[in-house]
């Protein structure tokens, strides 16, 4: 019953979105753009484009849906979101991708009063000795396993998370140390980020469904985003 209810709601959401897109197709540039986003400071790159587009076309409105990579990918594939902003590499075989120049880096998040907090960086040998709170997506993609040189069963993983905000409370309460990308600790004033050494980058991608029939508003956003990224590259 819950499965069919979820699928029915997805059909209703997609139908509503299509009706809005069709309504604005032949009029002045306006409409709604839905973007699914993982947690990343790279979101600032998208916001810069959103502001530029909205300043020029004030009847274009944006709707941001936060979530983990797998949930966002599913919604993009089903056409519920126009775009998705991803941290790291998933299976994008059903989608078009555009890599951002901006990259996050992986590291360890701990309390400011922890003895490790003053370190300029942290090595895999040090990390492997700690009780860890890990990103489920990061572990699933194998990138953390590869960097650490160990499998999940060989690590002391006390908890996992899909979005960092609640993981930050676990770190504050001394449950363990979080493996995360940079910037997310800013939501918790008592936490600090220590980068991995050697550095481990997390690439960012803007993605959309293959053969997507964009609304005029979504097409304008994509063109503006690509132009902004190309402009940065030329600077």
Residue spans of the language-model regions?
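Beta-alpha-beta core module
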Residues: 93-99, 103-105, 165-211
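Hydrophobic hinge/microswitch elements
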Residues: 68-81, 87, 139-192
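A late-sequence structural motif
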Residues: 45, 194-235
């Amino acid at each position: 019953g819950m499965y069919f209810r979820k699928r029915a709601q997805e059909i209703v959401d997609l139908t509503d979105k299509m009706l809005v897109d069709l309504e604005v197709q032949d009029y002045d540039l306006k409409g709604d753009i839905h973007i699914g986003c993982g947690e990343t400071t790279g979101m600032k790159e998208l916001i810069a484009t959103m502001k530029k587009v909205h300043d020029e076309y004030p009847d274009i409105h944006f709707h941001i849906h936060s979530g983990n990579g797998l949930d966002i990918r599913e919604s993009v594939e089903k056409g519920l979101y126009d775009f998705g902003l991803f941290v790291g590499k998933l299976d994008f075989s059903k989608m078009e991708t555009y890599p951002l120049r901006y990259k996050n880096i992986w590291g360890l998040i701990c309390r400011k009063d922890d003895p490790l907090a003053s370190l300029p960086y942290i090595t895999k040998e040090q990390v492997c000795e700690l009780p860890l709170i890990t990103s489920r997506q990061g572990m699933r993609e194998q990138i953390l396993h590869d960097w650490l040189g160990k499998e999940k069963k060989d690590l002391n993983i006390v908890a996992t998370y899909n979005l960092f905000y609640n993981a930050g409370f676990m770190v504050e309460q001394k449950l363990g140390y979080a493996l995360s990308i940079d910037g997310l600790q800013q939501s918790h004033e008592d936490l600090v980020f220590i980068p991995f050494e050697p550095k481990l980058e997390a690439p960012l991608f803007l993605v959309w469904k293959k053969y997507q029939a964009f609304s005029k508003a979504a097409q304008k956003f994509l063109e503006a985003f690509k132009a902004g990224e190309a402009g940065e590259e030329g600077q």
